[in-house]
Design a protein with these regions (language model features):
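Class I Rossmann-like S-adenosyl-L-methionine
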Residues: 2-148
């Protein structure tokens, strides 16, 4: 297996190249800290962004994605529960957080559906692994067919 150590890029025989953009990965990392460890997003996000090397536009995207996902958490969890073929309380917390970010992109941001699904699945592949990314892909496709 050949590893390219750039953020989110993995090259391996038989697998396609996966690129996860830094803003989504930072939003995932902060959301995970908030949901699992009770971290304060308003303290952790600026800290992560200050050392990220992102430009102003990407910082703004990460900020809106994170804070918006937290604001819409109840609604988006409710919708995801309706479309999931698994009991939502049994779903891996990492998957739940990836879906929260993806659902916010679908329902509340100006991200085209296909791009939101693709970026969310790539994020899942990178941070959770291929097997969990399959579930994320299936659920994101169901959610992308839903309109609010």
């Amino acid at each position: 297996m050949v590893l390219n150590l750039k953020l989110g890029s993995v090259l391996s025989k038989g697998f396609r190249k996966v690129n996860v953009d830094k803003p989504r990965q930072i939003a995932f990392e902060v959301l995970t800290e908030v949901m699992q460890n009770g971290a304060y997003s308003n303290l952790l996000l600026p800290q992560k962004l200050s050392v990220s090397g992102l430009d102003t536009r990407d910082k703004a995207f990460a900020t809106e994605l994170l804070y918006g996902s937290i604001r819409a958490l109840g609604r988006n969890d409710f919708i995801a529960r309706q479309y999931s073929d698994r009991n939502w309380s049994d779903v891996d917390p990492g998957i739940v957080n990836v879906i929260r970010l993806g659902a916010y992109q679908l329902f509340d941001m100006r991200v085209p559906n296909h791009a939101a699904v693709d970026a969310t699945v790539n994020l899942a592949r990178t941070v959770l692994g291929e097997s969990k990314a399959s579930f994320v892909n299936a659920l994101m496709r169901k959610l992308s067919a839903k309109s609010l």
